[in-house]
């Protein structure tokens, strides 16, 4: 008990935790990309669906990053295939998944500017209402560590509408989207914070033409 309460030990423990946090954050910035805070109070309509016609292709394996990018490229009038883009996708991990930094790099090669943001639901909805589909980084399933890139194309007061490339997650077949998620369920998926990436939650790419 005396050892635990020792000021030297407490200081050592504090510095160890602080050093670990700083080291983890630096590594995350290098691998994942630098986060830009994006928090707003409102300034968007109560419901919105991006009217631009697009198709939703289904991925075969771990290519959600490329399929999300392909969807966005088609939104900007450029024919794109998720399979083809995945072959040139940078920042792949050994298991085939892709760091967010890879999405930013690929879109930059295609002439699009992607800003990796962390923010609130208001910021996400405002971006959708601008007419440009953001790509969110979410959990594939609540409580699981598998992560997933997917474009968001609309919302109403209670739901978000996604252009889902994973067939198992598609739950509807509407004009422009194939997945409808309640705000409550979306927040569970959108919280991607883990011990290895504590600051990376509620993230999305804000994408625009250069």
Feature-to-residue mapping (PLM):
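Active-site-adjacent substructure of cysteine-protease-like catalytic cores
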Residues: 113-171
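Noncatalytic regulatory segments and standalone regulatory/sensor domains
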Residues: 93, 129, 133, 155-210
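Mid-chain, structured segments of secreted extracytoplasmic proteins
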Residues: 93-122
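Active-site-adjacent structural segments surrounding the nucleophilic cysteine of cysteine proteases
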Residues: 9, 13-16, 20-95, 140, ...
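Extracytoplasmic/secreted envelope proteins and their assembly/folding machinery
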Residues: 65-73, 82-86, 100, 104, ...
């Amino acid at each position: 008990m005396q050892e635990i309460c020792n000021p030297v030990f407490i200081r050592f423990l504090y510095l160890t935790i602080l050093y670990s946090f700083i080291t983890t954050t630096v590594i995350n910035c290098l691998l994942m990309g630098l986060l830009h805070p994006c928090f707003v109070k409102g300034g968007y309509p109560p419901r919105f669906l991006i009217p631009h016609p697009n198709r939703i292709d289904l991925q075969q394996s771990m290519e959600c990053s490329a399929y999300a990018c392909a969807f966005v490229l088609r939104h900007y009038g450029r024919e794109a295939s998720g399979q083809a883009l995945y072959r040139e996708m940078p920042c792949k991990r050994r298991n085939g998944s892709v760091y967010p930094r890879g999405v930013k790099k690929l879109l930059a090669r295609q002439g699009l500017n992607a800003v990796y943001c962390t923010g609130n639901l208001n910021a996400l909805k405002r971006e959708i209402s601008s007419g440009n589909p953001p790509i969110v980084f979410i959990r594939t399933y609540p409580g699981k560590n598998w992560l997933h890139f997917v474009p968001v194309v609309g919302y109403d007061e209670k739901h978000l509408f996604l252009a889902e490339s994973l067939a198992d997650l598609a739950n509807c077949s509407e004009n422009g989207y194939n997945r409808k998620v309640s705000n409550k369920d979306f927040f569970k998926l959108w919280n991607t914070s883990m011990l290895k990436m504590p600051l990376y939650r509620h993230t999305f790419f804000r994408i625009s033409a250069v």
